[in-house]
A protein has these predicted regions:
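Catalytic core of nucleotide-sugar-dependent glycosyltransferases
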Residues: 1-337
Length: 337
């Protein structure tokens, strides 16, 4: 039996799964505008605060605390979304901890896994540089790492406090002793990283760090829905697919941005499929919107031409898999550089 804590519970029961509905975490999304430059300019501190808020809300999911107090498990799998406090799940249950991350291997994960740092050979995601890095770029790499490490150190007391707040009562109710945060944080059995040599720097990894970039891509891509297939078939010049993903919503763009985008897209000789979350007035005839689109099916279609996105690691492997041409519009802190 697997207990699955998810913000997207299935409509029907699944054999062998005990579902805990964590959709309460989605309540924070309307208050988070990734197009607001005040948030973007906060850089990674904004992202880490967002991650901690998600961790706090997840603990409020109905049935989660009971599962932690009364359940018996052999391992814990968590996805790391910039919140180190989730180390508490395995610490409370006293079982091996398997962690999945959403980005490539970075110095903070090297530190957590006690691996030799690659600062002199591998550019940070904030440091676009050729490889091998020239001296000034290596110096810049070290400086940026020092700044990021200092920023995390300044927030460490917040992390420790939240770790104790969320997990100390659960550990006490279970009858176990919550270990100090460092003991829990470094006790990772396996780390899966969202990385692959096709889009990330080659680097040495310890045996318990495994690259799984592109794991979410299905080998058998389903056909397009009939309405989209008919649309692509009737587009002799081809189709441009425009998507900002799920967190960064096109509907939240400023009005002037949406107006200018419609003007530019309307002048193109291509059909444009735009993932847009609400109705959009004044659309040119060649611009078609949907709140959701089967992007893998679109990118693999012979009529597809260009994929416009914000450099998300969930989106790029799909485009690499089919050899899609990408036009990147970096926006969120981890993609803007």
């Amino acid at each position: 039996m697997v207990t699955w804590v998810t913000p997207f519970p299935p409509d029907e029961k699944v054999k062998g799964l005990n579902i805990i509905d964590a959709s309460i975490t989605a309540t924070i999304l309307p208050d988070v505008d990734m197009n607001d430059m005040r948030n973007v300019n906060k850089g990674m501190s904004f992202v880490r605060e967002f991650g901690r808020n998600i961790s706090t809300l997840a603990m409020q999911a109905k049935g989660l605390k009971e599962a932690l107090v009364k359940g018996k498990y052999d391992a814990v799998i968590t996805e790391h979304f910039f919140s180190d406090t989730d180390a508490g799940y395995a610490a409370v249950l006293q079982v091996p901890w398997i962690q999945v991350n959403s980005v490539t291997m970075q110095p903070n994960y090297e530190h957590q896994m006690d691996e030799v740092r690659t600062l002199s050979t591998v550019p940070l995601y904030f440091n676009p540089s050729e490889i091998p890095m020239p001296f000034l770029n290596r110096l810049k790499n070290v400086g940026m790492f020092a700044f990021m490490t200092g920023a995390e150190w300044l927030e460490r007391s917040v992390v420790l406090s939240l770790y104790e707040k969320l997990f100390a009562p659960v550990a006490a109710a279970r009858g176990t002793t919550l270990p100090p945060f460092p003991d829990a944080y470094y006790n990772v059995s396996i780390l899966f990283v969202n990385s692959h040599s096709s889009f990330a720097s080659a680097m040495s990894l310890p045996p318990n760090v495994i690259e799984i970039g592109g794991y979410h891509i299905k080998e058998d891509v389903p056909p397009l829905p009939k309405d989209l297939q008919d649309l692509l078939d009737s587009s002799p010049q081809g189709v441009i697919y425009f998507s900002m993903g799920s967190v960064l919503k096109s509907a939240n763009f400023p009005a002037v941005t949406k107006k200018e985008l419609l003007k530019v897209l309307g002048e193109l000789p291509y059909t444009v499929l735009w993932k847009f979350e609400e109705q959009l007035e004044g659309r040119p005839k060649n611009v078609h919107i949907r709140s959701w689109m089967p992007q893998a099916s679109i990118l693999g279609n012979p009529g597809f031409r260009v994929y416009t996105n914000h450099h998300c690691l969930a989106l790029l492997p799909i485009s690499f898999g089919v050899g899609a041409v990408c036009f990147i519009l970096p926006n969120i802190p981890i993609s803007r550089h």
